[in-house]
Amino acid sequence: MQNLSITQVDTAKVSVIQDFKEITKMRLALSVVFSSVAGYLLGVDTISWSTLLLLSIGGYFMVGASNAFNQIIERDLDVLMDRTKNRPIPSGRMSVNTAFIIAAVFTISGISVLYFINPQTAMFGAISIFIYVSLYTPLKTKTPLSVFIGAIPGAIPFMLGWVAATNDFGIEPGTLFMIQFFWQFPHFWAIGWFLFDDYKKGGFFMLPTGKKDKSTATQIVIYTVWTVVTSLIPVFGVTGKLYITPVSGVLILILGAFLLRYAIRLYKVKDAKTAKQLMLASVSYITLLQIIYVADKFIRAWI
């Protein structure tokens, strides 16, 4: 009996930890932290490990807060979809009050931690949470334009790192914002495509036309092209201190060609399998792009 009780307690602890990770979307939060760190490394002259730590913690809190508030607001819709019905709130494993406390603590903690870096970083963090929770989340069931609104907080992390490093907003962080802003569309429209039926159950408008049609596929191709084009702008030396060499530009162009290949394939075949491949390709693209940008800067400094 004692062994059974210990096992039950251990299982309960694991469940609580898993629910906490899910309500804050830890994996997504860590990918956002990665973007912020990349932006910081691009903007900084001398790395401050304490600032980097604060940025990572604050960024995690910021994303966790947004996701927790999102799941509170969408709890009645999440229960309708296969992908989300087992989340902590709709499954009944976590109360709304508990989720709200987590969201509130994460919001206050995130903004406070980012403020220790500089006020501008905290301001952009607060703006990100506000837009995601107050505008993007409620608009998802009302208009396809919600993706355009959601692309704003989604594009802030890359830029946020630069602002944390420099306490300044100029053409450099603006360019980083633009790159990740355009990237959001092929990424999220691909998700909206292969999860179309599930999103439909919850009443979400995730595709620009509301349908898996030629017009949506065309827009995916167009925004994929814009993503690649904006990614190459720093090669031409017109974005202030943000610069990459032609060699890095060629690498990004190759990555862009692979990304565009999947977008064009989706335009041709219009199936869920290709949409999922495009989504995975988009994740690889933005991750490798950020690595190339950072590597380019430090290799130039060492040579």
Functional labels for PLM-detected ranges:
Residues 2-15, 73-94, 189-216:
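Cytosolic, membrane-interface loops and tails of multi-pass inner-membrane proteins
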Residues 31-37, 87-90, 149-165, 214-215, ...:
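Small-residue-rich segments of transmembrane alpha-helices in multi-pass membrane proteins
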Residues 34-75, 83, 107, 111, ...:
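Membrane-embedded alpha-helical segments that form the functional core of polytopic membrane enzymes
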Residues 61-69, 131-138, 179-196, 228-231, ...:
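Transmembrane alpha-helical segments that form the membrane-embedded catalytic/substrate-channel core
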Residues 83-121, 212-236:
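Multi-pass membrane catalytic core of lipid/isoprenoid biosynthesis enzymes
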Residues 95, 215, 260-288:
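Interfacial loop-to-transmembrane junctions
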Residues 96-164:
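Intramembrane alpha-helical segments
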Residues 291-303:
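Juxtamembrane boundary at the C-terminal end of a transmembrane helix
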